Amino acid sequence: MDRDEFAASIDHTVLGPETTWGDVETILNEAADHGMNACIPPCYLPEAADYENAPKTIATVVGFPHGQHAPGVKRDEAVTAWDDGADEIDLVINVGRLKAGEDDAVAAEISDVVAAVPVPVKVIIETALLSDDEKRRACEAAVEADADMVKTSTGFADGGATIRDVELMSEYLPVKASGGVGSYEEATAMLDAGAVRIGASSGVAIVEGHPGDGD
């Protein structure tokens, strides 16, 4: 994978509760300058939409970080995010519903968001909290709901992306590996395992580790 293609697979991310507009500006500038995407909190989308040095793709999160919003709230949050300029939506499932065996409710919630916005929806299943069977069922719900991608983690649970989880999830949909990916080597390992996108707060270091960076 050449340097530009590799950079375009990175979602350079800032989503902490203490995130300021200044932090978002830094992420936008770094993403644009290095050819990455950006993933930012929804409250900063209006400013980001008007920002001069913005990357081509700006993603945001819905139902973040625990996924326990009411379904209608998630749908409305997604619509607002799209209206405010989001190019992609990263949606957190209700893990409790999944663990209780309410897979139809999980799929319906995802479907509501997918139907409400004309942009790609990535479904965050929070792998660190799930058994392998639950991971498979979460991916099946995402497939049933016509989601575009499944994503490993929010970064707020213990544990992040693993090679094993990426391999499992990629049997169902394209995968975004997120959580604990901090170097070029780690990102490449995830891509080799089947991921098509990487979410990371250390996107600059990851891209600068590519052998073709600076050519």
Swiss-Prot record:
One Gene Ontology molecular-function label: deoxyribose-phosphate aldolase activity
Compartments where found: Cytoplasm
Keyword Cytoplasm assigned: yes
Keyword Cytoplasm: yes
Pathway membership, UniProt: Carbohydrate degradation; 2-deoxy-D-ribose 1-phosphate degradation; D-glyceraldehyde 3-phosphate and acetaldehyde from 2-deoxy-alpha-D-ribose 1-phosphate: step 2/2
Major place of residence: cytoplasm
UniProt name for this protein: Deoxyribose-phosphate aldolase
Upper classification of the organism: Archaea, Methanobacteriati, Methanobacteriota, Stenosarchaea group, Halobacteria
The encoding gene: deoC
